[in-house]
Amino acid sequence: MKRPVTGKDLMIVNMGPHHPSMHGVLRLIVTLDGEDVVDCEPILGYLHRGMEKIAENRAIIQYLPYVTRWDYLATMFTEAITVNGPEQLGNIQVPKRASYIRVIMLELSRIASHLLWLGPFMADIGAQTPFFYIFREREFIYDLFEAATGMRMMHNFFRIGGIAADLPYGWIDKCLDFCDYFLTEVVEYQKLITRNPIFLERVEGVGIIGGEEAINWGLSGPMLRASGIPWDLRKVDRYESYDEFEWEIQWQKQGDSLARYLVRLSEMTESIKIIQQALEGLPGGPYENLESRGFERKRNPEWNDFEYRFISKKPSPTFELSKQELYVRVEAPKGELGIFLIGDQSGFPWRWKIRPPGFINLQILPELVKRMKLADIMTILGSIDIIMGEVDR
């Protein structure tokens, strides 16, 4: 980093990698003129673990536990992208019941990720109370995850061709109860935060990104939608069963930190709508033991239909990836999570390139903080929403 040659006495400050507001091991070298930011240089790589190279020496089923360590707050999405690639390479069909359960898990994971963004973001700008509120709702989601997958985090639930296990007894009723409860809590967040004049002073007009600028920087997710671009891969690519549900893309025009907050808050409400529709329309209904009903062929043969299964086949460790390449992507809470996959007719991928949304979105940070105040760095960085596990990989 070159020190600007001026007549002013500039100060260079290291923020991180151990600063509590860095959201992981991010280091910023900030050049200050008093309280004004002259330059900012992010230093990455403190959490690099070679995830792409590890993939080249593992079968997909062996690699699944690794991918949950990218974005460890939204692990369902990393699992989804890991199985979606081989499914498309092998033209593997997923039963509709399994696809619906995947959608439910993905949207619950999206809400949990947005909640754990909201609490620390508010703490960064000086509001401690919401930090404790969000853990209350997040615990309910983790209880649902634990009942369905056995793990509160790092679920290892998705499989090539479906999911690892069907939903347990009573899970659907618990999830519907959570949906009704959570909608009232979102209203509470709006009353507590959105109309707070101190909060508005800190975020309104801070870190503005225009629509064209957002596209040029390759931004995605709430960062892009808050800049007036209603782009959501769930609508564009229509993967899983998202095209069967009624929901709207949430977006704002202002492009500032407040707009990014509003997009994420309203996205949680839309996720609840999707979950409720998926639960009510789940193929096979809420009956838990579909496998035992499958044996009753004489009484009701429809339960043997492909769509009612939760998984087609348990994948073999020797599952071969055909000799071709493709790019597959999902709409993760932080943006477009993609994988460029090259198979070579073996059990291991020849190339596994990860496109993490946090890494791309973080690149615009130096442009946003220039000519801003030192305290605004925390607001802008918090509004981007990064997890260093996926930034460094």
From Swiss-Prot:
Q: Which cysteines are joined by disulfide bonds?
A: none
Q: Which SUPFAM superfamilies match?
A: HydB/Nqo4-like
Q: Which reaction does it catalyse?
A: a plastoquinone + NADH + (n+1) H(+)(in) = a plastoquinol + NAD(+) + n H(+)(out); a plastoquinone + NADPH + (n+1) H(+)(in) = a plastoquinol + NADP(+) + n H(+)(out)
* EC number(s) from the headed UniProt entry: 7.1.1.-
Coiled-coil regions, chain positions: none
Q: Quick check: keyword Transport in the entry?
A: yes
Which Gene3D superfamilies did the record assign? Cytochrome-c3 Hydrogenase, chain B (1.10.645.10)
Compartment annotation: Plastid, Chloroplast thylakoid membrane
User: What does the record list as GO biological process?
Assistant: photosynthesis, light reaction
- What cellular component GO annotations does this protein have? chloroplast thylakoid membrane
For membrane topology, the record states:
Peripheral membrane protein
Record keywords, A-Z: Chloroplast, Membrane, NAD, NADP, Plastid, Plastoquinone, Quinone, Thylakoid, Translocase, Transport
Q: Name one GO molecular function term.
A: quinone binding
Q: Which HAMAP family match?
A: NDH1_NuoD (MF_01358)
- How does it associate, per the subunit comment? NDH is composed of at least 16 different subunits, 5 of which are encoded in the nucleus.
The record's function comment reads: NDH shuttles electrons from NAD(P)H:plastoquinone, via FMN and iron-sulfur (Fe-S) centers, to quinones in the photosynthetic chain and possibly in a chloroplast respiratory chain. The immediate electron acceptor for the enzyme in this species is believed to be plastoquinone. Couples the redox reaction to proton translocation, and thus conserves the redox energy in a proton gradient.
UniProt record similarity statement: Belongs to the complex I 49 kDa subunit family.
Q: Which PANTHER family match?
A: NADH DEHYDROGENASE [UBIQUINONE] IRON-SULFUR PROTEIN 2, MITOCHONDRIAL, NADH-UBIQUINONE OXIDOREDUCTASE 49 KDA SUBUNIT
Under which name does UniProt file this protein? NAD(P)H-quinone oxidoreductase subunit H, chloroplastic
User: What gene is this protein a product of?
Assistant: ndhH
